[in-house]
């Protein structure tokens, strides 16, 4: 069944767990995400980036995910990830997205507040929840690129004012994570003190972007079959758990799914060179994604919460 992020994250905040927001761009990824959550009876947020919408077409993507969500035995939210174009946000709402993100983090604070208020007013009028972002992440993923020098952490004072003025439903905060597979040059150093202060001062559920763990075994497997991902490094699982204990209720995961898919498809093609059935080839990637998603559900503590 289709629900909103607000509903899922409010329950997560009360229950002290987090919901996974997993990015999709095709049928097989969506199938894997939903199947994993059904098996573990967990609610899920299926996230779609601007580039995924461009890749599939908004009508196709909307119809596919909504149909699967309505047939699912668990609560599913269809969410626009990193929406920066007001017109696209409008289109997503009209095509049945139950939650949208307005990412005005690239703009000065006053401008971010203004555009977020505009989106909130429109979305709330039709029962769609709104995620906003304050502070910036480094790294590259899809159409989001932020130089390390530009990246900045969320200021607690600004966060308190921002939520009060915009009335957004959830807030994505920057505490040191980044997009993509190369998140840290050394050890991960997340700003947990800052997160705790923000969580104490604002009333809405919090979101952590750039939270893939970049599983070493999957990197090793991918490299074994021809990939070149030597320096890939993600957020440690222990840090994810600590962030949840400090108020994070939505954890965005995309890179880990891409890596799992790539590693397993590479393995399949090498081990079965005589197979040319696209369904079998892609099916190997789908199963790998499903297993990774199941491990994330356990990490986030949302198994059995549907």
Label each PLM-derived region with a short phrase.
Residues 5-11, 26-52, 58-75, 83-205, ...:
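Alpha/beta enzyme core
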Residues 15, 47, 101, 275-278:
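A short, mixed-charge helix-start or loop-turn motif at secondary-structure junctions
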Residues 2-5, 58, 262, 293:
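Alpha-helix initiation and N-capping motif
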Residues 224, 235-306:
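C-terminal alpha-helical cap/extension of soluble enzyme domains
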Residues 1-20:
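N-terminal amphipathic alpha-helix/helix-capping segment at the start of soluble metabolic enzymes
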């Amino acid at each position: 069944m289709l629900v909103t992020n607000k509903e899922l994250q409010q329950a997560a905040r009360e229950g002290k767990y987090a919901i996974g927001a997993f990015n999709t761009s095709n049928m097989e990824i969506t199938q894997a995400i939903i199947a994993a959550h059904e098996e573990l009876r967990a609610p899920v947020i299926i996230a779609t980036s601007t580039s995924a919408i461009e890749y599939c077409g908004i009508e196709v993507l909307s119809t596919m995910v909504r149909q699967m969500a309505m047939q699912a035995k668990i609560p599913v939210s269809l969410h626009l990830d990193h929406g920066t174009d007001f017109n696209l946000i409008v289109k997503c709402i009209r095509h049945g997205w139950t939650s949208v993100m307005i990412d005005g983090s690239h703009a000065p604070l006053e401008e971010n507040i203004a555009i977020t208020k505009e989106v909130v007013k429109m979305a709330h009028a039709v029962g769609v929840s709104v995620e906003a972002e304050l502070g910036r992440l480094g790294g590259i993923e899809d159409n989001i690129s932020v130089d390390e020098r530009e990246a900045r952490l969320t200021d607690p004072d600004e966060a308190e004012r921002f939520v009060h003025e915009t009335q957004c439903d959830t807030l994505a905060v920057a505490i040191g994570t980044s997009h993509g597979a190369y998140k840290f040059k050394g050890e991960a150093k997340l700003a947990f003190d800052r997160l705790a202060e923000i969580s104490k001062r604002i009333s809405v559920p919090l979101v952590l972007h750039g939270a893939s763990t970049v599983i070493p075994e999957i990197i090793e497997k991918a490299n074994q079959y021809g990939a070149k991902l030597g320096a890939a490094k993600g957020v440690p699982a222990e840090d994810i758990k600590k962030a949840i204990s400090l108020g994070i209720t939505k954890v965005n995961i995309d890179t880990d799914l891409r890596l799992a898919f790539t590693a397993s498809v590479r393995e399949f093609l090498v081990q079965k060179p005589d197979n040319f059935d696209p369904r079998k080839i892609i099916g190997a990637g789908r199963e790998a994604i499903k297993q990774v998603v199941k491990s994330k559900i356990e990490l986030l503590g949302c198994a059995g919460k549907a």
